[in-house]
Amino acid sequence: MPSDDRFADAVKPALEALLSDLQHTTEVLRRAHISDRRSQSRDDFEQSYDLQGNLNTQSVSNGNITTSPYKRRSSEGKDYSKSQERIYENESRLNPPVYSRPSVQSLLSQVEEPPIRASSSRKSLGPPSQAQSYSDVRSNGRSPSRDPLHSDSMIGTMNGELSSKHGVNTIPKGDCAACGKPIIGQVVIALGKMWHPEHYTCCECGAELGQRPFFERNGRAFCEEDYHNQFSPKCQGCHRAITDRCVSVMNKNFHIECFTCAECNQPFGEDGFHEKNGQTYCKRDFFRLFAPKCNGCSQPITSNFITALGTHWHPDCFVCQHCGVSFNGASFFEHNGAPLCERHYHESRGSICSQCRGAINGRCVAAMGRKFHPEHFRCSYCNHQLTKGTFKEVDRRPFCHKCYNNTYALTPA
């Protein structure tokens, strides 16, 4: 896969440098190890030869017929040569010379091969006598060192060098839950599984989630945007997902900034909001649109009001429509749908005494285009009440017949 190629290209220079160091170190150790093996085998043979010589000398002194020590020494020398050849063959088989630099794939493949046991090779070293002497050497505490080119030792050294010097971890941490391949390097642990960073993605949009916050739902991983779009409540104002604080009213959810007046789109202040037909309004717009209007000023009524003449009034607006005097709980008079005080009511109807300017509530005298209380309709000269209904008018003033005749009848025209 592309990700595997990128990883191989990234670690290739580090592996090349490390393998070069390993090649040099291995060759030096191999030569030292072979030399040590030969010296140990020679010492073992000399001990065995000395033992045989002593036995031969003892047998001759006892008068026994034995093989000549010169012949035995010659045969032992031949056995020694054969033993050395076997040792060298085994050493060559265990420690082959490094003719070329091993590849990364060959080193990693050796991890799966079982390590070669040193005991199996030691059993094939020469005759029984030499094998026995070699075992004796081991029992004396001189055990040979482990083969430096042993596969598990070499791979372990390589892993340690890569981890300490280059920060590259070559030990698989587990299998990726997405692709099923081993994970070497960075790993994402989520939903109880392990993933390659590039394989742990949103199940909706496919975006990588290794370095981003994510949400889990029914065992599936979602990026923040897709999770909120699918499962978060929606704002009734903008119809987008709500991811933070919200306002819940009338079984609806709103962003705080979207919870505004349906008329002026301004946020609600300390006065709160009012609801009408599923819409929210600020106090000013709600009363302006839906509150009853005062018949006096045509403004919305928001508090106390007076109902009169089939309509509503602010208490301050329910006054005489001519003089503006408040009725103060007293009676009022209506004329053409307007509340009036008594005086202006009678003025509007023409029922004001022309003499006293008082209201005429009962009988009245209509004369000269005016109205009078009966007791106020008098002669302008003698001030007698004109009760008979006959009078004389001079300059819009009433006179009785007597005063008229005395004053105006004798006056020449």
Swiss-Prot record:
Disruption phenotype: RNAi-mediated knockdown leads to developmental arrest at larval stage L1. Residues 49-69, 118-143 have a biased composition (Polar residues). The keyword Transferase does not apply. One of its GO terms (molecular function) is vinculin binding. Gene3D superfamilies: Cysteine Rich Protein. One of its GO terms (biological process) is nematode pharyngeal pumping. Keywords: Cell junction, Cell membrane, Cell projection, Cytoplasm, LIM domain, Membrane, Metal-binding, Repeat, Zinc. SMART domains: LIM (SM00132). Residues 174-232, 233-292, 293-350, 351-410 form the LIM zinc-binding domain. The keyword Disulfide bond does not apply. Residues 33-45, 73-92 have a biased composition (Basic and acidic residues). Isoform a: Expressed in all 95 body wall muscle cells as well as in the pharyngeal muscle cells (at protein level). Isoform c: Expressed in the body wall muscle cells and in the pharyngeal muscle cells. CDD domains: LIM1_Leupaxin, LIM3_Paxillin_like, LIM4_Paxillin_like. One of its GO terms (cellular component) is M band. PROSITE patterns: LIM_DOMAIN_1 (PS00478), LIM_DOMAIN_2 (PS50023). Residues 33-157 are annotated as: Disordered. It comes from the Eukaryota. Required for myofilament organization of the pharyngeal sarcomeres and for pharyngeal muscle contractions and hence for pharyngeal pumping. Together with lin-8, might be required for myofilament organization in the body wall muscles. Belongs to the paxillin family. LIM zinc-binding domains 1-4 are sufficient for the localization to dense bodies, adhesion plaques and M lines in body wall muscles. This is Paxillin homolog 1. It comes from Caenorhabditis elegans.
